[in-house]
C-alpha cells in the first residue's frame, strides 16, 4: 500500500550530492512515505550514482523508491518503481525492461482513464496549481482533483503541483488523500519539520 506523502527529489543547481541526500534523509525522518528521484537532464552514470544512495536511504526508512522516466536504470538499481510522464515510454513499453511498480502522470480525465486501462499501479493528478517544477504547463486546477475523487475508485492517485501546507486543506476538501510535493519539503528551511507538518495534516482527515 502506497502512503499518502510522496516526495519527488529534483536535485537543485549548485547542490552537492551530499546536500541532496541530506535533505532527502531529513524528509524521510519527518515521515515521507514514498520517494522518487527525478533527474531529467542527467546522464545515466550520475543518475545511477545518486539513485544507489537514495535507494539505500529509502530501504533504511522502509519506504518505496521510484525513479523517474528510466525503467532501464530502475531495473539496474533494483528500484521499487518507475514513474512515467505523458511523453515518456508507455507502461507496456516500460514493463519490457522493468518488473516493478509503474506510476503515470496525468493532466486531464482522458489521460487518467487511459492510465487505468494501461494498468498502472498509481497515477498523479495535476498540476493543481502552476509550478516552476513544470514551467509552461497550465494548471489542471482543483476541478481535476474533484473529478479524480469521484471517478478513480480504489486506484491510488496523488494530487500534485504547487501543493504546500498553506493550500493543502483546499486539496483535501476537493477529495485528495495523497499528495506529491517537491518544493514544500525539498526547499523548506527544515525538511523534517515540513514533512511532519504535511503528514499530520494528511492523516488528520478520514
Swiss-Prot record:
InterPro entries: Aldolase_TIM (IPR013785), ThiamineP_synth_sf (IPR036206), ThiamineP_synth_TenI (IPR022998), TMP_synthase (IPR034291)
EC number: 2.5.1.3
MF (Gene Ontology): magnesium ion binding; thiamine-phosphate diphosphorylase activity
Residues noted as binding 4-amino-2-methyl-5-(diphosphooxymethyl)pyrimidine in the record, renumbered to the chain: 36-40, 68, 105, 134
The keyword Methyltransferase is assigned to this record: no
Signal peptide feature range: none
Pathway(s) per entry: Cofactor biosynthesis; thiamine diphosphate biosynthesis; thiamine phosphate from 4-amino-2-methyl-5-diphosphomethylpyrimidine and 4-methyl-5-(2-phosphoethyl)-thiazole: step 1/1
Function: Condenses 4-methyl-5-(beta-hydroxyethyl)thiazole monophosphate (THZ-P) and 2-methyl-4-amino-5-hydroxymethyl pyrimidine pyrophosphate (HMP-PP) to form thiamine monophosphate (TMP).
Protein name as catalogued: Thiamine-phosphate synthase
Higher taxonomy: Bacteria, Thermotogati, Deinococcota, Deinococci, Thermales
